[in-house]
UniProtKB/Swiss-Prot annotation:
Disruption phenotype: Deletion of the entire oleABCD gene cluster leads to the complete absence of nonpolar extractable products. The oleABCD deletion strain shows a significantly longer lag phase than the wild-type strain when shifted to a lower temperature.
Purpose of the protein: Involved in olefin biosynthesis. Catalyzes the elimination of carbon dioxide from beta-lactones to form the final olefin product. The S.oneidensis oleABCD genes produce 3,6,9,12,15,19,22,25,28-hentriacontanonaene, which may aid the cells in adapting to a sudden drop in temperature.
Name of protein: Cis-3-alkyl-4-alkyloxetan-2-one decarboxylase
Residues in AB hydrolase-1 domain copies: 30-275
Length: 318
């Protein structure tokens, strides 16, 4: 069934003794899609299918996720920096170093924008889907469920013993209608044992909340880099019923990316590419076509002015 739902060739990159799985479909300018937690490259399957005839679609599974290896702590240090290093190594191995359309979701925002902060000149467009690339907004407390997973033995038992994080997310992450049995099973399938759920837990434990926490300075540095991208053509599609990446995060993105095209989906949750797949993919394809047309018609120095005019046109809000 998985081969039917994810009909792409498997590719693997060796990373310090671990195999990192990635999708690499199509030819043309690269579209790099970075997933979060507790999902995997499966999240982007429909977008890959929609774009692979015209673009090179690259979708890694982070170590510990999807079809990548899932080593214990002795075999991999589950940190944000290592995630960014892995993404850089993958793109370097594919010689992908320019004209990147970067698509990010959940933790993928921090990882993807961490890469972008290192190489801002490589980024052509940004597509932002229910994610963050900055510290928890002052107006947003850490949800209790994440606090329990991050800080307690009970959280460890629930996440690694009962797959609570991945399983529950497959239910509450969509709002329009439930995932089908087969789609839900595909989301949770890689996390099928205590050992194979290590990444799901380590991601939550890696959330920095205060100075001195691991990754706190790195997140600060990534956030500080965002002004470099204020004039990069940006599309934001946002499910407003996400209990983690909610309107507080969207407000921060609007501040950082004042020229972005923004589409809000009032009846959608965290997994917006499941809740509103056809609509979001249509927005992405239109955005890419529109910005490509502008890039070929106007002086690059003036392209943001043209893009601003387009992005400020009336938007249909759902």
């Amino acid at each position: 069934m998985l081969d039917t739902l994810l009909p792409f060739k498997r590719h693997f990159l060796s990373r310090n003794g671990n195999k990192l799985h990635y999708i690499n479909e199509g030819q043309g300018e690269p579209v790099v899609m970075v997933h979060g937690n507790p999902s995997w490259s499966f999240y982007y399957r429909n977008l890959v299918s929609a774009l692979k005839d015209t673009h090179q679609c690259i979708v890694p599974d982070h170590i510990g996720c999807g079809l990548s290896d899932k080593p214990d702590d002795s075999g991999y240090d589950y940190t944000l920096k290592n995630r960014i290093d892995d993404l850089e190594a993958l793109l370097d191995s594919l010689n992908v170093k320019e004209n990147i359309t970067l698509v990010v979701h959940d933790w993928g925002g921090m990882i993807g924008m961490g890469y972008a902060a290192r190489y801002p000149e490589r980024i052509k467009r940004l597509v932002i889907l229910n994610t963050g690339a900055f510290h928890l907004p002052d107006t947003k407390p850490l949800p209790l469920a994440l606090w329990i997973c991050r800080n307690t033995l009970l959280g460890t038992v629930l996440v690694r013993g009962f797959n609570a994080f991945s399983s529950i997310a497959s239910y509450v992450g969509v709002k329009r209608q439930p995932m089908s049995k087969y789609i839900r099973e595909a989301y949770v399938a890689p996390f099928n044992s205590w050992a194979n759920r290590i990444s799901t837990l380590r991601f939550v434990q890696d959330i920095p909340l205060k100075p001195g926490d691991r990754n706190y300075q790195l997140v600060s540095d990534i956030a500080a880099s965002l002004p470099k991208f204020a004039k990069v053509p940006t599309l934001i599609c946002w499910g407003l019923q996400d209990f983690v990446f909610d309107k507080h995060f969207l407000v921060k993105w609007r501040e950082h990316m004042p020229h972005a095209q923004v589409h809000e989906f009032a009846d959608c949750g965290h997994y917006i590419l499941e809740d509103a797949s056809d609509e979001v993919i249509t927005h992405i394809k239109h955005f890419m076509t529109e910005t490509e047309t502008l890039a070929t018609q106007v002086n690059p120095a003036d392209s943001i002015t043209e893009f601003e005019s387009a992005s400020q046109a009336p938007q249909a809000e759902r």
